[in-house]
Amino acid sequence: MASASTTWSMSCLKSALPSIQPISSSSLRFSCGPSPSRLRICKPKSSSRLLHSFVGLAPLHPLLSLSSQDSTSFEHSFTVIDNGGRVFAMRHGRKVPKLNRPPDQRRALLRGLTTQLLKHGRIKTTKARARAVRKYVDKMITMAKDGSLHKRRQALGFIYEKQIVHALFAEVPDRYGERNGGYTRIIRTLPRRGDNAPMAYIELV
């Protein structure tokens, strides 16, 4: 049993292994098979044989190949495996405003805000909700500019009040006929009393 003062090193570990005689290059002979591209290396029989390493991410005899002079080349003895992995891009810039609600409640909230904004022309809500509802209001106005029956039915499926849809399709072509976007405006205001949430007005241009 080693004493506490003994310093363990790689040389001590290598000395505990059985000695292996090095194979000189002159003792190797090559025999050509039927194909000239395949070469076999015939080694002389030795009393101590090295076991083949596992064909995976395993070192090829790390203790035997590691020397005290070149201790940093341990990672170079690993075999490289190509597992056919693919790298996919991340979803940068595709953030969905959750508004602290599940999907069904979030959609109902955005439908209600869109209906009230198209009905009154200006509403006051939180800044996050105003920025989230702006996309849907612009989409409804773009549908009204198209004026087709299919777009009208799509708007009826999103806006809660039927009269607002008919008034929207009748007024939008004259009001926003020359405008290709930017139908709403967000104006920041004082934060809400109580929880200090940032508030804003969103209105039709």
UniProtKB/Swiss-Prot annotation:
Molecular function GO labels: rRNA binding; structural constituent of ribosome
GO cellular component terms, A-Z: chloroplast; cytosolic large ribosomal subunit
Any one Gene Ontology BP term: translation
Secretion signal span: none
InterPro entries: Ribosomal_bL17, Ribosomal_bL17_CS, Ribosomal_bL17_sf
Keyword Transit peptide annotated: yes
SUPFAM superfamilies linked: Prokaryotic ribosomal protein L17 (SSF64263)
Quaternary structure and partners: Part of the 50S ribosomal subunit.
Record-stated family: Belongs to the bacterial ribosomal protein bL17 family.
Record-linked HAMAP family: Ribosomal_bL17
Protein name: Large ribosomal subunit protein bL17c
